[in-house]
Amino acid sequence: MTDPALRRLTTAQTVTLAVMGAIYWFVAALVVRWTAANWVGSDGPTALVFALIIVATVPALFLGMAVAHIDRDQAQISAAIMTGTALLLDGMALTWGQSLYGSNPAIVLGGAASIMWGAGVAIVLGMLLERRA
């Protein structure tokens, strides 16, 4: 049997994870657009949203790994690929398409911060969820 530490993702798995990251980013961007005016700038609601992001990220990681047929021994790299894709798209949207998030600069900033928070959460959860040999 191959040592899990030596296993590499296939091209199909990598592409699947990148697509899942793009889907998650797009859903997050739409959630920001539709809801951020209700919580950006308010400490209590913002803290609640950040907590909900943690809760939502766990099943999102497991779903992405399931779709790509990846076991927990590769959770960290899976989280990194999905998150990296989402952050690349977020950076492009913030540079060239801020209106995706809304027209109010404070909402755009708060929404982008929530997406970056989600990316950090995903990376940490990927490390914590990875099954070690």
Residue spans for each PLM region:
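Juxtamembrane/disordered regions of integral membrane proteins
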Residues: 1-133
